[in-house]
């Protein structure tokens, strides 16, 4: 494979640009520490006292008995044997639906 001189030059320039940007980010981090870090800002936010959506949804699905005409937890799942079962498409959904 032959590379033209222009493509090699562009690759070197882009690589140097990436190193410069990473160096600037690292320099900013070294000066300000975690104060400039977005993750640190997210950690400092107050914790919501309510359960996260996935936990609430899981509790609802696992603890709720349904009837065929009921809307289980707002998921519009399938009601199988009195339990809310989320709709899963494809081969996996067919296998899981057949098992339940």
From Swiss-Prot:
The protein's UniProt keywords, in alphabetical order, are:
Calcium channel impairing toxin, Disulfide bond, Ion channel impairing toxin, Knottin, Neurotoxin, Secreted, Signal, Toxin, Voltage-gated calcium channel impairing toxin
Q: List the disulfide bonds.
A: 60-73, 66-79, 72-84
Is Nucleus among this UniProt entry's keywords? no
Q: What is the annotated signal peptide range for this record?
A: 1-23
Q: Which InterPro entries does the entry mention?
A: Omega_atracotoxin_CS2, Toxin_23
Propeptide residue span(s): 24-55
**Tissues with expression:** Expressed by the venom gland.
An example Gene Ontology molecular-function term: toxin activity
Subcellular localization: Secreted
Q: Decide whether keyword rRNA-binding is in the record.
A: no
Give Gene Ontology CC terms.
Answer: extracellular region
Query: Where does the protein principally reside?
Result: secreted
Q: What is known of its domains?
A: The presence of a 'disulfide through disulfide knot' structurally defines this protein as a knottin.
| Family statement | Belongs to the neurotoxin 15 family. 02 (omega-actx) subfamily.
Q: What does this protein do?
A: Potent inhibitor of insect, but not mammalian, voltage-gated calcium channels (Cav).
Q: What is this protein called?
A: Omega-hexatoxin-Asp2a
Organism per entry: Atrax sp. (strain Illawarra) (Funnel-web spider)
């Amino acid at each position: 494979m032959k590379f033209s001189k222009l493509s090699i030059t562009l690759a070197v320039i882009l690589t140097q640009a990436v190193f410069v940007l990473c160096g600037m980010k690292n320099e900013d981090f070294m000066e300000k520490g975690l104060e400039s870090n977005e993750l640190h800002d997210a950690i400092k936010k107050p914790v919501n006292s309510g359960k996260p959506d996935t936990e609430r949804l899981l509790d609802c699905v696992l603890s709720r008995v349904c009837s065929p005409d009921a809307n289980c937890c707002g998921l519009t799942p399938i009601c199988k044997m009195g339990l809310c079962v989320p709709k899963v498409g494809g081969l996996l959904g067919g296998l899981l639906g057949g098992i339940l």
